[in-house]
Amino acid sequence: MYEIEFTTIHSYGSEREGISVPVVLKAGENSVRLAASIDTGATFCIFRNELAEALGLDSANATLKRFRTANSSFEAFGHEIEISVLGVTTVSIVYSFADASINKNVLGRVGWLDRVRLGLVDHDATMYLAPYDTE
């Protein structure tokens, strides 16, 4: 039998679509609180455009990236910021949608999932989380 240790347990509620968690994004002295969906199929972390504005991030100083999905494509601006989820904090490049009409916040593999240990028991709507480097 295998054992994995976690530092946090979170009940995410089975009545909602997807697995949503509380997130704090921070850039310099600015921070915003939001809910984001964990998406193991998403390569990157991508957030609503208005959150980048609230953090004081300037698209002129960002890395522009074009994303392609099965049925669409979109552009997003990348910035290095701090992400905190349930007490687990990391610094990562995350993206904000260039199109302000896209209303999604997603925690993806690169920059978040690759930095944590994540366990799910969906039957119980329970998530287990720890920083990856926890011994």
Residue ranges and their predicted role:
Residues 1-135:
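Pepsin/retropepsin-fold aspartyl endopeptidases
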